[in-house]
Amino acid sequence: MPVTMSQAFIDNFLGNSPKWFKIAILSFLVINPIVFYLNPFVAGWLLVVEFIFTLAMALKCYPLQPGGLLAIEAVIIGMTSPSQVLHEIEANLEVLLLLIFMVAGIYFMKQLLLFVFTKMITKIRSKVVVSLMFCIASAFLSAFLDALTVIAVIIAVAVGFYSIYHKVASGKSFTDDHDHTSDSHGEGHSLCEDELEAFRGFLRNLLMHAGIGTALGGVCTMVGEPQNLIIAAQANWQFGEFALRMGPVTVPVFISGIATCFLVEKFKWFGYGQQLPEAVHKILSDYASYEDAHRTKHDKIKLVIQAFVGVWLIVGLAFHLASVGLIGLSVIILTTAFNGVTNEHALGKAFEEALPFTALLAVFFAIVGVIIDQQLFAPVIQWALSYEGNTQLVIFYIANGLLSMVSDNVFVGTVYINEVKAALLDGQITRDQFDLLAVAINTGTNLPSVATPNGQAAFLFLLTSAIAPLIRLSYGRMVWMALPYTIVLSIVGILAIETGFLGEMTQYFYDSHMLIHHSVAEAAKGAVTGH
């Protein structure tokens, strides 16, 4: 039967996506202008829900195309303007540069990272200990590096492990070329499905623990997350003061997070507790031995160079010697120059992982433009400001948390701190209350947002990365595996604020002269525009 033009159009539209998904996206494109004409506010929230839907279907169809179509239509019908989208991209240029250069830079440090983490996994047999090490290492790194950088590192390691196992299990040697994305191979070799599933589960566990670790560490310091920098600038806090003010909330949360990691692994809850199969452990151990035996002086000097560049990376970011993206660019230049990677094709491979996500983030900023232009969050902010004292802090924490679960936490944190700054300058709140609110906003945007990949850019990057389909890490599975952490981190954060512990410890820091009282004039002088 010949294919009609309409059938060909539907077949081509969004490629191999399910037909129902294609129809859903086309329906959204038809419905949105009508709803916008009737009620712009409702249309704005409808668009946000639709965009979240495209993210949830990331394994069926990469969100750039369906989300991009929704964003383009939103601009065309006037929900936001091209200038507003450009403004959002300009305000978040550091995040885009981070994705373009830092993730590519990490690609050229993969040998060192694979060396370190292979040793960690092959030498330590206890899954609980390995999980705790991944979580704590991610938290420590995220306090100095951006969470996206840390997740990029862990993804690179996981892909390395997966490809090594897949290659050997498919009947090839360590040095052979191999496509690790295909589970069917000729020559009579077939992968053991149970073994492969168990290994996928093991890698899922490690990646989720690492992802949560980035949130635990990222909330602690002003360089941990992009919104932390914006909040610190608004409040005129330096590195030490930021960490100290966050401490009454972040320290109990960190301890609780590590305890949760231990418990879910020990009792195999929420899909955790997957053991590394003995056969896979043997392959990885053999690979480590093979690499050690065949490591030439050229290989060893490459590892040394990568280690030195790694030190520069941590020092450069910890002391904020340049913007994150530019430090990433320097990592690319230093590792490739001293390790002899001068072929354009070899350089290009490093950018394959991050550029689709960079484009997706630019689309996300178009949705953020709609949220701003249609004032979708305005009612929530006004309601939260109507309360006082500890109750106000808790409400801001919860309101930030709920919105960060469905929207980018950089955006949510920026909107809230700007609104609270405006309230301070209007005389609605005192400077000390503003400082406490800044802590509530920072912790509120960073901690509950682990609930879904929407809030944490690092989680979204993980969901849309090359490793996710290989280890069967879907949107729903991420939400389920993050659930125990979401509950524990959110509740401990609320209790630290609700019980007055944050206020009491902050007062103690004032009395001990570890902190100083800031003035409203300082805040007015230090105002930055953020978004």
Swiss-Prot record:
Entry-linked InterPro entries: Na+/H+_antiporter_NhaB (IPR004671)
Transmembrane segments: 23-45, 66-86, 97-117, 130-164, 206-226, 244-264, 307-327, 352-372, 393-413, 451-471, 478-498
Subcellular location(s) of the protein: Cell inner membrane
Pfam families named among the record's database cross-references: NhaB (PF06450)
Its membrane topology: Multi-pass membrane protein
Keyword annotations from UniProtKB, A to Z: Antiport, Cell inner membrane, Cell membrane, Ion transport, Membrane, Sodium, Sodium transport, Transmembrane, Transmembrane helix, Transport
Reactions this protein catalyses: 2 Na(+)(in) + 3 H(+)(out) = 2 Na(+)(out) + 3 H(+)(in)
Domain of life per record: Bacteria
GO cellular component: plasma membrane
GO MF: sodium:proton antiporter activity
PANTHER family (alphabetical): NA(+)_H(+) ANTIPORTER NHAB, TRANSPORTER ARSB-RELATED
Family: Belongs to the NhaB Na(+)/H(+) (TC 2.A.34) antiporter family.
Function: Na(+)/H(+) antiporter that extrudes sodium in exchange for external protons.
Protein name: Na(+)/H(+) antiporter NhaB
Source species: Shewanella loihica (strain ATCC BAA-1088 / PV-4)
Lineage: Bacteria, Pseudomonadati, Pseudomonadota, Gammaproteobacteria, Alteromonadales
